[in-house]
């Protein structure tokens, strides 16, 4: 069993004695350099493991390689592959299909995904849709039971007879 120091030396020897970069900046986000590429890319909102593997393969980078040891050229390739992800994969794999305003299939990343999600909920509230009303009232939206679960606030005890 290798200790942490021995492991670091082994990894440095394997990667031509390059120093590990602990933070790698991709798409204006700091990603952990100690993780493999397929796990590190999941730090970006809108990218899961499956999409991370496809992005790495599309960029010609080994998904199991440690992100911090990759040279700058390969990190730039990853950044470019993330930008053209919509062209690489079929439309059913994108996270925003048939957008309400444009009707296009898109893959949202970063803060765009959060802003669009919030905008959709506000739109549902504005048109007074059932889902919008449930969101407004802070209740369950997808048809779950609410008789006994999903309660908030402090519990009210039952008073006993003397």
Swiss-Prot record:
Protein family: Belongs to the universal ribosomal protein uS13 family.
Assembly and partners are described as: Part of the 30S ribosomal subunit. Forms a loose heterodimer with protein S19. Forms two bridges to the 50S subunit in the 70S ribosome.
Its function, per the record, reads: Located at the top of the head of the 30S subunit, it contacts several helices of the 16S rRNA. In the 70S ribosome it contacts the 23S rRNA (bridge B1a) and protein L5 of the 50S subunit (bridge B1b), connecting the 2 subunits; these bridges are implicated in subunit movement.
GO MF terms held by the record: rRNA binding; structural constituent of ribosome
The protein here is known as Small ribosomal subunit protein uS13
The protein's matches in InterPro entries, at most eight in alphabetical order, are given as:
Rbsml_uS13_C, Ribosomal_uS13, Ribosomal_uS13-like_H2TH, Ribosomal_uS13_archaeal, Ribosomal_uS13_CS
Going by the UniProt record, its keywords in alphabetical order are:
Ribonucleoprotein, Ribosomal protein, RNA-binding, rRNA-binding
What does the entry list under GO cellular component?
A: cytosol; small ribosomal subunit
Q: State the Gene Ontology BP annotations.
A: translation
Provide the residue span(s) of the region labelled Disordered.
142-162
């Amino acid at each position: 069993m290798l200790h942490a120091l021995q492991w670091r030396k082994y990894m440095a020897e394997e990667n031509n004695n390059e120093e590990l970069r602990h933070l790698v900046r991709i798409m204006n986000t700091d990603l952990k350099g100690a993780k493999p590429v397929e796990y590190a890319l999941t730090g970006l909102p809108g990218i899961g493991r499956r999409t991370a593997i496809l992005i790495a393969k599309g960029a010609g980078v080994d998904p199991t390689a440690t992100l911090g040891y990759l040279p700058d050229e390969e990190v730039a390739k990853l950044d470019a592959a993330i930008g053209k992800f919509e062209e690489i994969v079929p439309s059913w794999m994108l996270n925003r299909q048939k957008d309400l305003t444009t009707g296009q299939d898109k893959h949202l990343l970063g803060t765009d995904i959060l802003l669009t999600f919030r905008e959709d909920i506000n739109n549902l509230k504005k048109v007074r849709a059932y889902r919008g009303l449930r969101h407004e009232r802070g209740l369950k939206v997808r048809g779950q039971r609410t008789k006994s679960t999903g309660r908030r606030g402090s519990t009210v005890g039952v008073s006993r007879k003397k």
